[in-house]
Amino acid sequence: MDNKSAYGHLAKWFEYLNDDCGYEQWSQYVIDTLKSYPVSIGLDVGCGGGWFTRAFVKEGYQMTGLDISAQMLDYAQEQSFKSGLRAEYILGDISKIKLPKRYHFATAINDCVNYIPKSKLKAAFKNVAAALQKGGVFLFDISSRRKFTQKIANTVSADDREDITYLCFNTVEGDEVTMDVTLFEKQADGSFIRKDERHVQYIYDEEEIVQALENAGFTLVKVEGHLGEDKTLADRIFFVAQKA
C-alpha cells in the first residue's frame, strides 16, 4: 500500500499525541552515535513533522528532511520556522527519488523503514546509498517483530484529550500491519469532527535488513536494541551501517 495519504489528518497532532515518547533521550542517543564520525551534512529520511531533523540542526548539523507526506512536511516547515532551526525539506518517496550525492550521513527514525513495502526496500536503501558520499553513515531503526506480534496485534490504542480523541485499531496479517486511525477533532463551537486514515507497516527481521543493506553497498557496523538495550527483548532495533 502507498502510505502517501497516511498522516493526512494526523500530521498536526502527531508530536502532540506522542509527547511522552522520550524524544529528547532518543535523539541524544542518535547524536552520540553520530559523534563517532566526521560528519556535518545529513539527510533525515521519513522526517515526518521534523522533530529529529530540528534536534540535529540544534546540534549543529546541516539537515535536509525527506518525507512522502505533504501534510507532515507542511508541519515540519512550520515548526522549523517557529523554532529558528532551519532545514531544507523535500517531498518524495525514498524508493523512487534520486538525490544529489552530497550527504555525510542519513537517518530514518521512528518506524520510517517499517512503512516501506518489502518490494521497495532494496530500492530505498540503494537510493540512500546513492545520496551518501563514500564512507557515509546510515543510522535507522525498525519496530521489532516482537513488538508487532506481542504488543500491537489485534489491539486498540486510545488517547482522549480535551481537543482531540485518538483511536487506533491494529491488525496483523503475516508481515503486514494495518493501523486504522480515527480522530475526533474538537471545533470552536464545541462539536467534534471525525476523520479517518489508514497506515500500513511491514514487519522486518534483522536478516532481511542486513541483506538489503549489503545489496545497496553498505557494511553493517552495529545492531542493538533501542537506546542500547538487548535486541532480543527490544521493541525497537537500531542499525548503523556505512557506505563502502
Regions found by a protein language model. Name each.
Residues 1-37, 39-48:
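Conserved class I S-adenosyl-L-methionine
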Residues 122-134:
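A short glycine-rich, Lys/Arg-flanked "PGG" loop and its adjoining helix->strand segment in the class I
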